[in-house]
UniProtKB/Swiss-Prot annotation:
The protein, known as: Protein PAT1 homolog 1
Region spans: Region A: 1-84
Example of a GO biological process term: P-body assembly
Involved in RNA-binding: annotated span: 223-397
Gene Ontology terms for molecular function: poly(G) binding; poly(U) RNA binding; RNA binding
Gene it is expressed from: Patl1
Keywords: Cytoplasm, Methylation, Nucleus, Phosphoprotein, RNA-binding
Region (Region N): 85-388
Ranges annotated as biased composition (Acidic residues): 7-33
Subunit structure of this chain's protein: Interacts (via region A) with DDX6/RCK. Interacts (via region H and region C) with LSM1 and LSM4. Interacts (via region N) with DCP1A, DCP2, EDC3, EDC4 and XRN1. Interacts with the CCR4-NOT complex. Interacts with the Lsm-containing SMN-Sm protein complex. Interacts with EIF4ENIF1/4E-T.
Amino acid sequence: MFRYESLEDCPLDEDEDAFQGLGEEDEEIDQFNDDTFGSGAVDDDWQEAHERLAELEEKLPVAADEQTGNGERDEMDLLGDHEENLAERLSKMVIENELEDPAVMRAVQTRPVLQPQPGSLNSSIWDGSEVLRRIRGPLLAQEMPTVSVLEYALPQRPPQGPEDDRDLSERALPRRSTSPIIGSPPVRAVPIGTPPKQMAVPSFNQQILCPKPVHVRPPMPPRYPAPYGERMSPNQLCSVPNSSLLGHPFPPSVPPVLSPLQRAQLLGGAQLQPGRMSPSQFARVPGFVGSPLAAMNPKLLQGRVGQMLPPAPGFRAFFSAPPPATPPPQQHPPGPGPHLQNLRPQAPMFRPDTTHLHPQHRRLLHQRQLQSRNQHRNLNGTGDRGGHRVSHQDHLRKDPYANLMLQREKDWVSKIQMMQLQSTDPYLDDFYYQNYFEKLEKSSAAEEMQGDGPKKERTKLITPQVARLEHAYKPVQFEGSLGKLTVSSVNNPRKMIDAVVTSRSEDDETKEKQVRDKRRKTLVIIEKTYSLLLDVEDYERRYLLSLEEERPALTDERKHKIWSMYDNLRGKLPGQERPSDDHFVQIMCIRKGKRMVARILPFLSTEQAADILMATARNLPFLIKKDAQDEVLPCLLSPFSLLLYHLPSVTVTSLLQQLMNLPQSATAPAPSNSHLTAVLQNKFGLSLLLILLSRGEDLHSSDPTVESTQNNQWTEVMFMATQELLRIPQAALAKPISIPTNLVSLFSRYVDRQKLNLLETKLQLVQGMR
């Protein structure tokens, strides 16, 4: 796991004057704590206790070499009678269940004995496992107190979970426990800033504490120090002073000031006195299993004894993060450095107490800590993949309001601002600005007249001189603007509606009203005619159910309703000889009207139905244009086919002339007939034309009594229809709905064989129909 085989090979960054420098810094008066908590926050004289502690540190090497009871007696003399009993009882506090753990005892027995090196301070005491066997007996033999002095003096705290996800800076600052005027609390009182009394945590960190408050120097030189060692290897952390692996929660330049009792207990652990714990046993205490203190070199532990302890409950008034609870160590086979396998150090997180700060100051401090943490993550390769790592400077330089507007929007705003500066009448557009600069110019002119100093030239705003076009104001008109898209421009950035106003004359409005009224009348006629049609269709049922004497009246009623339907379709006015086709065309332009005509034709007489067919043939191109979307005209083909078998040859010839838009007399037609072209390009028109040609050919070939004049008319009409079919391109020719069977013999009488084959190809005649 590490580059070195043992902790002894790890290089130590230890200064010889560490204790001396620590003592010199402790001698300085902490003005910050005095201003915050008052001068009466400490019950005893801490300077005198610190001087005794400094003398104890000087006598530490001598006391470590003797291994007798003299060192303990000298230490007790320095600390005094009151602290002697307390320190001795605190140092004997060992959890019995943890010492009886077979995993812990096996790790103690299998640990190899390290060879002491010259120059080390009693390395056998720290590394030898035999010492643990000698002191284990006295430790277990002595009676463990049920409630220790520390548990009695300090507040009880419940077990706390990990507080990484909780913002500790939001906790309220507790009340001050002392007052500079009233005085100090008794020794057994709660330290300053300690939370209310709660359940105690059974950890070694709480057992080694002193009930006296701990003075901590504020981190003044580095205002917001960044946490060390988030992504560094343990070997690198060993070489970094005050790193998080060493358990030092303070900033690098601020060492903690421990109480005399804590310092005496830690330094006194180096002597092999009965009831005291060696660093080897100290590292195996359950509170330190898995902590950075257990994975250190004994020399490093001995040299950094005043800095390696994690913050105890006394420190939690300022560092409010409790020590993390770690599971008991697992069993590993013996090998080189078993303590490195059993104990995996984890760097504690530094969380300062900021309850004494202003809420806005706390929020700023929290943001800077997050930025510093992200910086270390990016530097150690924990950022985004693919090289998309942003430096801390770029992160701080990032504008939160960047990229909120497109370049087009920025140019838009700039143009609007520049347009506001373009003015032909500045006093009207910007009165206050002009008056302000006039006052400035007057004051500057007065100063120039009085003083002889250099003239001051004031910067003036230079506006672009662009001619402004005056636009006549037109209020927005909402009439006819429904469904229009909104249009935005520089002049009208929030234009609500782009209204299109069209002025119409009275004649146009009159015509539009007439068309609208005409369509409404047509719809009313269609509904009335449909009611008559339903009554006529229900006549047979009523006729069978009626009595014999009621049937003549029903027959007359049926005839009357059929005439009414025909009159509604044709729109014949009283006294008018021939009805107009306009009314019928209006009905045929509506889909419901076309379906209604197809249902009415079987009930009409032959003359009435022939008149409907004639009107349809005359206006077929217009009806085809109106039927392009509905395509309902093919429903009329079946009733028209049945009607053609009841019409004479003269009527069929006249109907064909109406369909082809030919005059009644035998005259030469125009070379191009748009009417016939529109009929041939529609499937209903082409199918109706082929049916008329087939029915007319049958009538003229089977009736020898037909006059020669009628035969000549028929021959001329057939010749014109054949020429038009040959002229129109095949792609423009529509596909007919049905093709008569006698059509090939019909065309063979009027064209040659080559043209007949071309007609067959165009009309897609199937083989065998010849």
